[in-house]
UniProtKB/Swiss-Prot annotation:
PROSITE patterns membership: ATPASE_C
Residue(s) at site: Reversibly protonated during proton transport: E61
Compartment(s) where it occurs, according to its Swiss-Prot or TrEMBL record: Plastid membrane
SUPFAM superfamilies: F1F0 ATP synthase subunit C
Pfam families xref list: ATP-synt_C (PF00137)
Membrane topology: Multi-pass membrane protein
Subunit and interaction comment: F-type ATPases have 2 components, F(1) - the catalytic core - and F(0) - the membrane proton channel. F(1) has five subunits: alpha(3), beta(3), gamma(1), delta(1), epsilon(1). F(0) has four main subunits: a(1), b(1), b'(1) and c(10-14). The alpha and beta chains form an alternating ring which encloses part of the gamma chain. F(1) is attached to F(0) by a central stalk formed by the gamma and epsilon chains, while a peripheral stalk is formed by the delta, b and b' chains.
Gene this protein is translated from: atpE
Name of the protein in question: ATP synthase subunit C, plastid
Lineage: Eukaryota, Viridiplantae, Streptophyta, Embryophyta, Tracheophyta
Annotated HAMAP family: ATP_synth_c_bact
GO cellular component: plasma membrane; plastid membrane; proton-transporting ATP synthase complex; proton-transporting two-sector ATPase complex, proton-transporting domain
């Protein structure tokens, strides 16, 4: 096993998780803030806003999970070794 490839795989796995969580993290914070503003403006639409928010948060979180899967593939099932 080449130590340079192993080291690069560990660094790439770290970048994969880190970069894959930045965008969804910002998006989730923005979406939650806007949902709270929407509920404050229209309390009668709370159920619809909450349902839409939870669905969109699940889609955003899936992006982070994809980054984690790529990182795990690089660490444990590395195609470059």
């Amino acid at each position: 096993m080449n130590p340079i490839i192993s080291a690069a795989s560990v660094i790439a796995a770290g970048f994969a998780v880190g970069l894959a969580s930045i965008g969804p993290g910002i998006g989730q914070g923005t979406a939650a803030g806007r949902a709270v503003e929407g509920i404050a403006r229209q309390p009668e639409a709370e159920g619809k806003i909450r349902g839409t928010l939870l669905l969109s948060l699940a889609f955003m979180e899936a992006l982070t999970i994809y980054g984690l899967v790529v990182a795990l593939a690089l660490l444990f099932a590395n195609p470059f070794i």
